[in-house]
């Protein structure tokens, strides 16, 4: 009886060790593949907000962290520096619209050195399907309405939805969501316009960041 218990215990121990080893080996073998997929995903998003023609560097490796309440979060946000022939051409920066209808909306905006928006994309949201989710490019092209826009003293008040006297469309039955995104993009552009040199001169300390 005692020998049988010992034998069973030894068998279980061997099985546990083998299972643990298999899990560890699987994680080791898939780690590089996961990293590669994350980099591809990040590169795809970055190239939507900063055209490939505008840079010759790897954007996901040219990242710095910035913190400011204008970016809608108390966390440091990544900013990706685009360069061509060693000269800065644009910045893609993540920010948050904290006042979406169903919570925070995470976005990324590409802005060139003249202050022109090259593109904006929604990274994550929890907005209502069929209503607020129209901010998602997979649903409508509304988010592309920021492309080509600039922010200055003369047009600051136009950076609102039409219901509030601005130039951006709201959605039928869903004004809160686009209002939150327009405000967040406006704040982001204003932040970059004000702090561009500071951002460009910071150390690159967050390459490969993606959530």
From Swiss-Prot:
Compartments (UniProt record): Cell inner membrane
Chief location bin: membrane
An example Gene Ontology CC term for this record: plasma membrane
Keywords: Cell inner membrane, Cell membrane, Electron transport, Flavoprotein, FMN, Membrane, Phosphoprotein, Translocase, Transmembrane, Transmembrane helix, Transport
FMN phosphoryl threonine: residues carrying this PTM: 175
Matching PANTHER family: ION-TRANSLOCATING OXIDOREDUCTASE COMPLEX SUBUNIT G (PTHR36118:SF1)
General function of this protein: Part of a membrane-bound complex that couples electron transfer with translocation of ions across the membrane.
Protein name: Ion-translocating oxidoreductase complex subunit G
Organism (species): Vibrio vulnificus (strain YJ016)
């Amino acid at each position: 009886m005692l020998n049988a218990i010992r034998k069973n215990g030894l068998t279980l121990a061997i099985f546990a060790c083998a299972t643990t080893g298999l899990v560890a080996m699987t994680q080791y073998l898939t780690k590089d593949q996961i990293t590669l997929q994350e980099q591809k995903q990040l590169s795809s998003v970055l190239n939507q907000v900063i055209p490939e023609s505008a840079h010759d560097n790897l954007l996901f490796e040219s990242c710095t962290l910035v913190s400011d309440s204008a970016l809608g979060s108390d966390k440091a946000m990544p900013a990706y520096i685009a360069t061509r022939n060693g000269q800065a051409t644009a910045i893609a920066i993540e920010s948050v619209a904290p006042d979406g209808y169903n919570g925070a909306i995470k976005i990324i905006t590409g802005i060139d050195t003249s202050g022109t928006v090259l593109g904006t994309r929604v990274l994550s949201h929890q907005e209502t399907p069929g209503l607020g989710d129209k901010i998602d490019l997979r649903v409508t092209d509304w988010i592309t309405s920021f492309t080509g826009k600039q922010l200055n003293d003369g047009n600051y008040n136009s950076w609102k939805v039409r219901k509030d006297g601005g130039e951006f469309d709201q959605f039928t039955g869903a004004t809160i969501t686009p209002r939150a995104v327009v405000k967040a993009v406006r704040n982001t552009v204003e932040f970059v316009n004000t702090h561009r040199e500071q951002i460009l001169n910071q150390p690159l300390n967050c390459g490969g960041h993606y959530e």
